[in-house]
């Protein structure tokens, strides 16, 4: 599919973004391990989350929906999970594969999990290694670093593990495995990463404690199903936020967006660039902080994005590079080498596609350097099969001088079904 973006004067009005992808995955996982019904609204019916749904259905869990944005999981406890009759397919979802590995490691049956061609190239050794330390038998290509991966699970031993890099997925996989261990599991982070797993484990009744940079989960009593309204995904909101900042007549309010402090690095970085952004009506939904975000057109300036800020905005770096292209001065992004092993090499893809549109941008081994301001020219872009690259190119095209074409844009459905329609409904021609 091809997406055509024409220049816009701005974005105006109120909008809601789809439910948070990270939380939607975890609702299905914990709802499947819990006893009783879990009913979630504002669930993201994107391709990645649907892969998680399919995996748990294959393990014998009764899941109704998603019907629109509502899903019901009728959990019967972890002992009700059964060996899948076929290979589990995580599709393009690294979250599905890595977190599922943690759960499968604790099950008394054999599983094989794989994914599409892109996911089969992404490294899994950071997860499989510590799970093997906990007692799981795991086999796969290149010493269990590449899928397909086979797991012979069973009773695990709790461990104390220091993450070699900041990774919410690795932390989450080990905490989920810790539910099935014979003693507590402690995970220590080099810097804070998104904490949705800890919050949701506690909400479902698990015994979770945080002390400094460490999180501990105990072999848990029975998890209990619950009702949850999933907040809007700030990673999806980021595309509208940057689009409003760089188009000249914008005044946009995004409603009910998750503002978990481990995810709001995008707001901090843009504030450092001079963005006119305000957050109002703070509240809680399902144990997660939620608020409305108002964004107005702004004159941006260059900044440095590095260190502990990176895990708090890692998914937003492609669209931050778009903001930087329109900012006055130099923006330096570093400590982001992890982006090279996402759905695409996001550093290379961002540099290539923004260069195509006329940006002054270059790669470094662990980041990007962008000089602005530049009025981008429009042109023909490749999504690289990566939803975040496709949407970043679309945002860049809104403020360009001519039409922008994004090829292979169907990948956007991974995280934001209906993105183009939502964008068009807000634009000033």
Curated annotation (Swiss-Prot):
Domain of life: Bacteria
Database matches in CDD domains: EPSP_synthase (cd01556)
Swiss-Prot/TrEMBL keywords: Amino-acid biosynthesis, Aromatic amino acid biosynthesis, Cytoplasm, Transferase
Record-level GO cellular component terms: cytoplasm
A GO molecular function held by the record: 3-phosphoshikimate 1-carboxyvinyltransferase activity
Record bears the keyword Signal: no
GO biological process, one term: amino acid biosynthetic process
Major location category of this protein: cytoplasm
PROSITE patterns attached to this UniProt entry: EPSP_SYNTHASE_1 (PS00104), EPSP_SYNTHASE_2 (PS00885)
EC number: 2.5.1.19
Binding sites annotated in the UniProt record for 3-phosphoshikimate: 21-22, 26, 167, 169, 315, 342
Substrates-to-products reaction catalysed: 3-phosphoshikimate + phosphoenolpyruvate = 5-O-(1-carboxyvinyl)-3-phosphoshikimate + phosphate
Active site: 315 (proton acceptor)
Pathway: Metabolic intermediate biosynthesis; chorismate biosynthesis; chorismate from D-erythrose 4-phosphate and phosphoenolpyruvate: step 6/7
Residue positions binding phosphoenolpyruvate: 21, 94, 122, 169, 346, 388
Compartments it resides in: Cytoplasm
UniProt similarity note: Belongs to the EPSP synthase family.
HAMAP family the UniProt entry points to: EPSP_synth
Primary role: Catalyzes the transfer of the enolpyruvyl moiety of phosphoenolpyruvate (PEP) to the 5-hydroxyl of shikimate-3-phosphate (S3P) to produce enolpyruvyl shikimate-3-phosphate and inorganic phosphate.
Quaternary state and interactors: Monomer.
Protein name from the UniProt record: 3-phosphoshikimate 1-carboxyvinyltransferase
Species annotation: Desulforudis audaxviator (strain MP104C)
């Amino acid at each position: 599919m091809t997406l055509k973006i024409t220049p816009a004067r701005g974005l105006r009005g109120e909008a809601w973004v789809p439910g948070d992808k990270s939380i939607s995955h975890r609702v299905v996982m914990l709802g499947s391990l819990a006893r009783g019904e879990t009913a979630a609204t504002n669930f993201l019916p994107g391709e990645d989350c649907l892969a998680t749904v399919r995996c748990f259905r294959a393990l014998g869990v009764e899941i109704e929906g998603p019907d629109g944005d509502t899903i019901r999981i009728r959990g019967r406890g972890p002992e009700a999970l059964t060996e899948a009759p076929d290979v589990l397919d995580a599709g393009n979802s690294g979250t599905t594969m890595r977190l599922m590995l943690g759960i499968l490691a604790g099950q008394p049956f054999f599983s094989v999990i794989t994914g599409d061609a892109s996911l089969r190239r992404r490294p899994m050794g950071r997860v499989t290694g510590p799970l093997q330390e906990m007692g799981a038998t795991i086999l796969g290509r290149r010493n269990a670093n590449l899928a397909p991966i086979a797991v012979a699970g069973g009773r695990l031993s709790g461990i104390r593990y220091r993450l070699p890099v900041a990774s919410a997925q690795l932390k989450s996989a080990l905490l989920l495995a810790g539910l099935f261990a014979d003693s507590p599991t402690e995970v220590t982070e080099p810097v804070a990463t998104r904490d949705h797993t800890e919050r949701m484990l506690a909400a479902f009744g698990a015994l979770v404690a945080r002390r400094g940079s460490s999180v501990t989960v105990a072999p848990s009593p029975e998890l209990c199903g619950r009702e949850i309204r999933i907040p809007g995904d700030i990673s999806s909101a980021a595309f509208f936020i940057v689009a409003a900042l760089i188009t000249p007549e914008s005044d946009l309010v995004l409603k009910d967006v998750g503002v978990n402090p481990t995810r709001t690095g995008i707001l901090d970085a843009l504030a450092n660039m001079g963005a006119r952004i305000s957050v109002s009506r703070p509240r809680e939904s399902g144990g997660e902080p939620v608020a409305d975000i108002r964004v107005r057109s702004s004159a941006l300036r260059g900044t440095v994005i590095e260190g502990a800020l990176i895990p708090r905005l890692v998914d937003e770096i492609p669209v931050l590079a778009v903001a930087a292209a329109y900012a006055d001065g130099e923006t330096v992004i570093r400590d982001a080498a992890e982006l090279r092993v996402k759905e695409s090499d996001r550093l290379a893809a961002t540099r290539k596609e923004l260069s195509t549109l006329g940006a002054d941008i270059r790669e470094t081994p662990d980041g990007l350097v962008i000089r602005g301001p530049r009025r981008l020219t429009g042109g023909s872009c490749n999504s690289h099969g990566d939803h975040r690259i496709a949407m970043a190119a679309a945002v860049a095209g809104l403020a360009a001088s001519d039409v922008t074409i994004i090829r292979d844009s169907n990948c956007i459905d991974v995280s934001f079904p209906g993105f183009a329609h939502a964008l068009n409904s807000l634009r000033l021609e």
